[in-house]
Amino acid sequence: AIDVGAKMHVAAIGPDRASEPVRTFGTFTDDLNRLADWFQECGIETVAMESTGVYWIPVFEILEQRGFEVLLVNARDAKHVPGRKTDISDAQWLQRLHEFGLLRASFLPKGEIAALRAYLRQRERLVELSATHIQHMQKALMQMNVQVHHVVSDIMGVTGLRILRAIVAGERDPGVLAANRDRRCHADVETIQRALTGNWRAEHLFALEQALALYDTCQEKVVACDKKIEATLKRIEAQSAKPVGELPPARSTKRQPNAVDFDVRTALHAVLGVDLTQIHGLGPYLALKLVGECGTDLSAWPSAKHFT
């Protein structure tokens, strides 16, 4: 078992395995490989560790790559087991609980599913950052009394983005800005012109320009994530042996905000053999996220009550 820390890891094995059953290792990669070497020399096959921050990830992945069965456990579960003595270290206590089978491993996806989850989580962080930059743009516009949001339902829609890019490019004429109006926009040209008559100040224009540039960067990175997600799904499909029938008609054809930039339904159907979006309330992205978090094999949860 390993007591994971930021600057060092304390490893403990059974006293019958070595004359020095508790050892301390650093956190550099060569330290982690020495830790794995020591476990192998002592005949260790399974290792338990607590999920401490993100510090567990490097040692977990290296041990898995070296062929160990690694159990990631919730620190709360280990602390609530009675009978601990005061003269025993955290690593020794964790090792003893593991030896007697008293630890419950947290579910962690493996292989391509783990990669899929990582790409999806990175994508969500980028979408959240994009929303922050949109708020910064809205603030800059309001400070200049440019009330685009009152005449355009979505400032990041076709009309809104055209107007924002024109402003950043140097256009100030309300008539010229209003000419960017999309034919589907409900507001008339005159109303848009009045809304686009602003108090142009250099510092607010600068903030708008930077927020728009950062938004564009986030969107570019989201597209890059989508490509990684699509490629990962294709690799998962190649590994799966699911019978693929005909894809049923979509329950809804409405495109959701921040939707993934490829046909998620078709990709998931090829992986799973069923269309999860036929379940009421389960859209393409939510189905994709479910697969990314839980994988394609739900045997880790014997029943719905275990799914927490």
Which residues are covered by each model-predicted region?
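A detector of single, family-specific signature residues
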Residues: 1-308
